[in-house]
Structures are given as C-alpha cells and as structure tokens.
Amino acid sequence: MGDKKSPTRPKRQAKPTADNGFWDCSVCTFRNSAEAFKCSICDVRKGTSTRKPRINSQLVAQQVAQQYATPPPPKKEKKEKPERPEKDRAEEERPDINPPDEHPVEQRDKDKSEKEQPEKEKKDREKEIIPAITKKPNSKKNRPKSDIHQSPPSERNSIQSGKSTTKTKNSHNSRPKLKNIDRSTAQQLAITVGNVTVIITDFKEKTRTSSTSSSTVTSSASSEQQHQSSGSESMDKGSSRASTPKGDLSLGHDESF
C-alpha cells in the first residue's frame, strides 16, 4: 500500500512548481497567485479540500426577505378551497362516469347529420350555379343575331315568328338542335366551380342566313311593286274607257244641229 501512495505525492508537489506558485481554489476554481493565503473571490483558505462555500449572512437575509415579500398565504387558501370541492366532484362524477358511454351512438348520429347538411347545401349551390353558367353562351349567341338583322320591321317580324316556331318545337324536344351554325367554328371554354367542370362550346352563325333573308325581302318588295303597278294600269284603262263615250256623244249632238 505504501508503494502505491509514494508515486502520487511527488506529482502533487510538482504542480505548483510548474505553474510558478499559482493555485486553484477548491470552491470557485479561481486561479490565485502564490502569495495569496486566501482566495481573492470566495475568501476560502488555501489547502481546503471541501467545496462547501461559507454562508454569507447578508445574502441569506436578502433571500429570506424576497421569499416573505411574496404573499404565500393566499396561494395556500386557493389550494385548500379546491381540495374540498374536488372530493365532492369526485363523488358526483362517479355516478356520471357511465352515462356518457350510454349515448355515444346518438352523438355520432348528430355529428353525421350536421356534416351531411353542409354537404347537401354545397351540392345545391353548385346545381344552382351550373344552369346560370350554361345560360351565358345562349345570351352571347342571341346578341349577334339582333345586331345583324336590324334593318326593316318586316325582317324583325319574320325572325320573331321563326323564333316562336323554334321555341314551340324545342319545348317538345329535350335537347334542342342548333340551326344555321357552322360546326367547324367550335370554341370550347372550360369552367370549374368547386369539383364540377362545365364545358361550353361557342359556334358562329352561317353567312348564308343574311343573304337568304335579304333575298326574301327583295322578292317580297318586288312582288308588292308589281301588284301596285298592275293596279295603277287597271285604273288608267278604266279612266280612258269612261272618257271615250262622252266624246262620241258630244260629236253626235254637234252633227244633229
């Protein structure tokens, strides 16, 4: 045992010689000079092996004053008050532990019904939005027709009568077919509302419709002019016939005298 301790002793003595007499405080680990008998920070004597610091009376007094400055009694009263109702609550909650388990099915049904109602409302709104969107292209298609055929009232009357006949026909058919439209000029527009996508196809009118309508108007106008001219010719002939017998009568009277 003595042999083991012998090599450790010279090592302890060698440290101060290597550090030129400086020593580390065993409490605050501050490196003091060799001349200092006590630590310059914590006033611990040189060579003490304990790390327990000395109790400073001033610091202890300050800490005690801070502890008593905060009012601990109201905290204790708050803790004591809920302790009594907690026991009462525990007794009241014991019979109520089972009832929430008895009605889980009703709560689930209510939750499902509440979730289904907004979903149905969303679907109804989407259905209302879709027809409003589908009506837009029809209004666009009808506008150019009114712009093209704004000449005489006779054409408007004929167009209105044609529209009325087409409406009556379309009322019977579930899906009306579009007429006087070039299928080659198809423009598709995709509109998405929520999870529903609506595709709208726009078609342009044929150029022949305007020429045929103008030709029909000109033919009707020419027929009216022919009727008027024939009526005027018949009136001229009647007037000439009525004038000739009067002249003959006048001549006969002259001859008799």
From Swiss-Prot:
One Gene Ontology cellular component annotation held by this UniProt entry:
nucleus
Residue ranges annotated as zinc fingers (RanBP2-type) are: 19-48
Q: Which spans does this entry mark as compositional bias, Polar residues?
A: 149-168
| UniProt-annotated stretches for the region Disordered | 1-24, 45-257
Q: Where is the composition biased (Low complexity)?
A: 209-233
Biased region (Basic residues) positions are: 169-178
Give the residue spans that cross the bilayer.
Answer: none
Single biological process term from Gene Ontology: regulation of DNA-templated transcription
- Does the keyword Zinc-finger feature in the UniProt annotation? yes
Please give the Gene Ontology molecular function terms for this protein: DNA binding; transcription coregulator activity; zinc ion binding
Keywords in alphabetical order: Apoptosis, Cytoplasm, DNA-binding, Metal-binding, Nucleus, Repressor, Transcription, Transcription regulation, Zinc, Zinc-finger
Major localisation: nucleus
Matches recorded under InterPro entries: RYBP/YAF2, YAF2_RYBP, Znf_RanBP2, Znf_RanBP2_sf
Protein localization: Nucleus; Cytoplasm
Tell whether Zinc is among the UniProt keywords: yes
Basic and acidic residues composition-biased segments: 74-129
Q: What does this protein do?
A: May be implicated in the regulation of the transcription as a repressor of the transcriptional activity of E4TF1.
Q: What is this protein called?
A: RING1 and YY1-binding protein B
Q: Which organism is it from?
A: Danio rerio (Zebrafish)
Give the source lineage, highest ranks first.
Eukaryota, Metazoa, Chordata, Craniata, Vertebrata
Gene name of the record:
rybpb
